[in-house]
Amino acid sequence: MVIRLGRRTLEDIHAHAESAYPEECCGLLIAGSGSKDVVDSIKMRNAFSGPRHDRYHIDPLELFRADREAASRGLTIAGVYHSHPDYPATFSKFDIEHSFPLYSYLVVSVSKGEAGDTRSWLPNQDHNSVAEEEIEILDVRREEDGVTKRA
């Protein structure tokens, strides 16, 4: 599988990861319905109740609201992104156990406050393994209606 992201969307995700450092950030990947073409991202609050340097949690009510917002624009949630402060962009055992198999999971490694390696993962139905997903970066510009056009 391939997930496609606009360059600006990836830059927004990296900026979010850097601003949250040394804690993990989290957010949603928004795409056209039934598509892996990510046209936007939505920052989410890290609602994890413990130390946030190696964990994140998205509040289910906030996820529901974001899903409704995306649907009102004819879009859908294609996945989740989060950062790994001072740790590789791998998908941890905790990440696997708490993932939703239909989503792509973009992980950004942030080293000393600077976003770097970014990888995408697809968990399997049994929550015991993941496959790496290819990331294709598109040079696109966003439109106000949520549709992206290639530059």
Regions found by a protein language model. Give the residues of each.
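Conserved beta-strand-loop surface patch within small alpha/beta domains used
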Residues: M1-I77, D86-A151
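Conserved, mostly hydrophobic/aromatic
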Residues: V80
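Short, well-ordered beta-to-alpha junction loops that form the rim of enzyme active sites
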Residues: S83
